[in-house]
Amino acid sequence: MVGVPGAAAFQLGCEKRVPAMPGSPVEVKIQSRSSPPIMPPLPPINPGGPRPVSFTPTALSNGINHSPPTLNGAPSPPQRFSNGPASSTSSALTNQQLPATCGARQLSKLKRFLTTLQQFGNDISPEIGEKVRTLVLALVNSTVTIEEFHCKLQEATNFPLRPFVIPFLKANLPLLQRELLHCARAAKQTPSQYLAQHEHLLLNTSIASPADSSELLMEVHGNGKRPSPERRDENNFERDTVPPEPPAKRVCTISPAPRHSPALTVPLMNPGGQFHPTPPPLQHYTLEDIATSHLYREPNKMLEHREVRERHHNLSLNGGYQDELVDHRLTEREWADEWKHLDHALNCIMEMVEKTRRSMAVLRRCQESDREELNYWKRRFNENTELRKTGTELVSRQHSPGSTDSLSNDSQREFTSRPATGYVPVEFWKKTEEAVNKVKIQAMSEVQKAVAEAEQKAFEVIATERARMEQTIADVKRQAAEDAFLVINEQEESTENCWNCGRKASETCSGCNIARYCGSFCQHKDWERHHRLCGQSLHGHSPHSQSRPLLPGGRGSARSADCSVPSPALDKTSATTSRSSTPASVTAIDANGL
């Protein structure tokens, strides 16, 4: 779908047959037939009134071809006449070389379009309706561009607009902005102030919408068909103010002027020799087919038409005056997206081709390896079958009578006639296997012998280390026993020390009058070991007194009877060595030590 609303364009094409103003392009084209073009005098510039619009390629963007006629390669200047001072919308539009009905209809369509957008937003929700109203006011005030308005409107309503919306706004929004500027100047206000005070003139909800909102929005779930005409019949009061308009895609056939492409800037001639006015450009990708449909029946006329079009197209390009046409082709961003998609598709195709080529190469290599393996096994099978055949033949010849003489000759002839390549006798294989087995057996025996020798050496090392450790432990035990004897002797000699802690004693055990302590705490703590000795010392016959002479140094024989009771220091040393709660006897320590 190409985005200029076709209804307005077709109405313009139908109504431009009747000249609406003296300076319309239709009169210029008709008058130029009888007289050469004459430069009209420019109207006086009124400082207080609106400034006449200068025709530049970007002055009009409403999609209507207002270029002056080109006769004999000389473009005539644009007409700048007006009927009078601009006192209304139609009179203000005369400075733009537009008929009054054309400008009023375009403005009415634009206002109804904006009103329909706001009503659609209000139908969704009041918040979205307020957003749409703000966007519409910002668009009319030129604070946002048409593209930004398009994007923000789609984001607010979450509905895609039809493709003709942007070209329609580009074509008709300048007319509305000029009208707003004229009214604001008349009221001595800025356009934004005037629009804020007279918002109802732009978004007039009392005027019915020209069409359903589905004509402005893309069908999300539908099949893309236009709404039925019964929905238009509901708005019958619309026909009282605005004439009915044909659908956007229906071709108008009322005008006698033939259709042609927008690139054709020269007016065509009818059979009577009169010029027809240039119709406004519609959907330009189909108008050229409509324009030249009657020429395809006559090839000569078609060639002449093509030559005239190319010649005048070049003249219009080089003549310095060319109107800007509404371009309905893709924008640069859309072209970039299309190229990006195309590049991505080509890359995917290249990747698929590369993967297919690799897969075919892998399959080819696998097929070659399979073929080689199959040939190898075929050769092996043939060799085995030949060996079996020769073996059976030899056995049959040996058992058959009269074959002993020729057996050696036949076998020799057979072995000599057999090719040397690829043939190995069975005896050779047997000898080779036997040699390999012998080598394996010898290697295993050597390995076992080496392992046995290593184990023997390890056992010897372990035995020597064990003997050394036992000797060391015995030496340590002996040294500990000797140290214990020395400590015992020292404790016996020093009777002034405490038997519990070794400090200077101040008290004596009342039971035996032998044990000495530094205090009652040490006596109570040592009582678990001393009470046995204390009881034995009371009887006066202790077995330890007989074993005293066995102590090294012979000190026990020279001591008195009351000192024959063993010292508790011996119990301490035995307790530290054996970790037991009862003290050991001196004879037990002597026996262990010696």
Swiss-Prot record:
Biased composition (Basic and acidic residues): 227-242
Expressed in which tissues: Expressed in embryonic stem cells.
Phenotype when changing residue 330 to E: Reduces PRDM14 and OCT14 occupancy on target sites, no effect on interaction with PRDM14, predicted to impair homooligomerization
Binding-site positions, Zn(2+) 2: 509, 512, 530, 534
Region (Nervy homology region 3 (NHR3)), start-end ranges: 426-475
Superkingdom per UniProt: Eukaryota
InterPro entries named among the record's database cross-references: CBFA2T1/2/3, MTGR1, NHR2, TAFH/NHR1_dom_sf, TAFH_NHR1, Znf_MYND
Cross-linked sites for Glycyl lysine isopeptide (Lys-Gly) (interchain with G-Cter in SUMO2): 29, 440
Ranges of biased composition (kind: Polar residues): 55-70, 79-96, 393-410
Keywords from the UniProt entry: Coiled coil, Isopeptide bond, Metal-binding, Nucleus, Phosphoprotein, Repressor, Transcription, Transcription regulation, Ubl conjugation, Zinc, Zinc-finger
Residues that bear Phosphoserine: 24, 255, 400, 567
An example Gene Ontology biological process: DNA-templated transcription
GO cellular component, one term: nucleus
Binding site for Zn(2+) 1: 498, 501, 518, 522
ZnF region ranges: MYND-type: 498-534
Domain observations: Nervy homology region 2 (NHR2) mediates homo- and possibly heterotypic oligomerization by forming a four-helix bundle tetrameric structure.
Primary role: Transcriptional corepressor which facilitates transcriptional repression via its association with DNA-binding transcription factors and recruitment of other corepressors and histone-modifying enzymes. Via association with PRDM14 is involved in regulation of embryonic stem cell (ESC) pluripotency. Involved in primordial germ cell (PCG) formation. Stabilizes PRDM14 and OCT4 on chromatin in a homooligomerization-dependent mannerCan repress the expression of MMP7 in a ZBTB33-dependent manner.
Assembly, per entry: Homooligomer. Homotetramerization is mediated by the NHR2 domain. Interacts with CBFA2T3/MTG16. Can interact with RUNX1T1/CBFA2T1. Heterotetramerization between members of the CBFA2T family is proposed. Interacts with RBP, GFI1, TCF4, PRDM14. Interacts with TAL1 and CBFA2T3/MTG16; the heteromer with CBFA2T3/MTG16 may function in repression of TAL1.
Further remarks about this protein from its record: Loss of Mtgr1 impairs the maturation of secretory cells in the small intestine.
Disease: Required for tumorigenesis in a AOM/DSS colitis-associated carcinoma model. May be involved in intestinal tumorigenesis.
Name of this chain's protein: Protein CBFA2T2
